[in-house]
Design a protein with these regions (language model features):
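Hydrophobic N-terminal alpha-helices or hydrophobic patches in metabolic proteins across all domains
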Residues: 1-150
Length: 150
């Protein structure tokens, strides 16, 4: 059984263009994570708050962040993307936050094949409300779990 975590060709991952693996579609409260051993999705939890994911959320294979997990990525798209879908993206920026006293960076990316977002090349070009929704989500989504994010 192939495992996208480590079996994807490294030439498909570069700073300018990469394949993102979607774990969580936008608009849901279920938090899925890929099981590193099996390569399958597992339900981590249902969010405790009434908030839902404001964008498709996943990771960039063959990368590592400070938390020893792959780099997190939010893929802005007009549609929800089915979990475990590979999406060819380009980065437009990064959101930095602190989660459990650790730096937690989220790459903000655009799929090459969504005409609604094709004009955005930099995070500063996003509508302020889009940025505010994403920021708000990450400030509050763990609040009822007793965890603090900055």
């Amino acid at each position: 059984m192939s495992n996208i975590w480590h079996d994807i060709n490294p030439r498909r991952i570069s700073p300018e263009k990469f394949m993102a693996v979607i774990e969580i579609p936008k608009g849901v409260k279920n938090k899925y994570e890929m099981d590193k051993e099996t390569g399958l999705l597992r339900l981590d939890r249902v969010l405790y708050t009434s908030t839902h994911y404001p964008a498709n959320y996943g990771f960039i294979p063959r990368t590592y962040a400070a938390d020893n997990d792959p780099l997190d990525v939010l893929v802005l798209c007009q549609e929800s993307i089915v979990p475990m879908t590979l999406v060819e993206c380009y980065p437009i920026g990064v959101m930095k936050m602190i989660d459990d006293d650790q730096v937690d960076e989220k790459i903000i990316a655009i799929p090459f094949n969504d005409p609604s977002y094709a004009e955005f090349k930099d995070i500063n070009q996003l509508p302020q409300h889009t940025f505010s929704e994403i920021s708000h989500f990450f400030r509050v989504y763990k609040s009822l779990e007793g965890k603090k994010l900055l």
